[in-house]
């Protein structure tokens, strides 16, 4: 993934908001370090469920409750710090830092190229922070490196096509598409969580019934 990050960062090297990154990256780095130190204490499923709730409420509010949705929000230090910290933490623990990042960046209504470039630069920085911890925890090895290199040509093609599409899509269509994707992806995370929970409950119930049945027979 880091190779794709470098290629994307090079492509958007002149299209990003440096001031926004100066706020977000340090807090996200702290979040990633905390995640590296504590990830074994947290369930990835529960973290993704929480992110699903956050993303669903965020996108639902945009589509159905917010007035003047196209009006840019002012940069807020506290909101940026909190969202970035959560993004760094969940990026390490659940590989899902996109939702908290979007919650801060999307309302700013940056020009679409600047939004994408800022997001790319942000995650490139965070992945660099995470890399030494992944190596230490053996989460990155020669096998995963070879796999990443094998997918590199496809990544380059995807980056090229994505950049071309970004240039032709209208600003409002772009933002509505992003919010729609967040809504759908968040709903899926919530559904997946409850499906897995139901499956576990059903398994426990079946085990309980089996025990009761055996006791009854004896």
Go through each PLM region and give its residues:
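Membrane-interface helix caps of multi-pass small-molecule transporters
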Residues: 33, 37, 41, 64, ...
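Small-residue-rich hydrophobic segments that form or flank transmembrane alpha-helices
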Residues: 1-23, 83-88, 98-159, 163
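Cytoplasmic-side transmembrane-helix entry/capping segments in multi-pass membrane proteins
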Residues: 19-28, 50-52, 74-84, 117-120, ...
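Interfacial loop-to-transmembrane junctions
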Residues: 162-182
């Amino acid at each position: 993934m880091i190779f794709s990050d470098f290629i994307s960062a090079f492509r958007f090297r002149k299209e990003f908001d440096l001031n926004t990154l100066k706020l977000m990256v340090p807090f996200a780095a702290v979040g990633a370090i905390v995640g590296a130190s504590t990830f074994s204490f947290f369930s990835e499923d529960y973290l993704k469920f929480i992110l699903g709730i956050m993303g669903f409420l965020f996108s639902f509010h945009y589509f159905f409750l917010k007035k003047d949705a196209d009006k840019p929000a002012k940069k807020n230090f506290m909101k940026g710090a909190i969202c970035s910290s959560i993004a760094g933490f969940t990026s390490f623990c659940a590989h899902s830092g996109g939702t908290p990042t979007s919650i801060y960046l999307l309302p700013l209504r940056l020009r679409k190229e600047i939004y994408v470039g800022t997001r790319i630069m942000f995650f490139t920085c965070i992945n660099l922070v995470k890399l030494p911890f992944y190596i230490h925890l053996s989460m990155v090895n020669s096998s995963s490196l070879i796999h990443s290199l094998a997918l590199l040509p496809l990544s380059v093609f995807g980056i090229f096509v994505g950049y071309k599409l970004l240039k032709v899509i209208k600003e409002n269509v772009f933002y509505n598409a992003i919010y729609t994707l967040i809504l759908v992806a968040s709903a899926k995370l919530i559904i997946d969580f409850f499906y897995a929970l139901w499956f576990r409950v059903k398994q426990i119930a079946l085990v309980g019934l089996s025990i009761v049945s055996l006791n009854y027979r004896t």
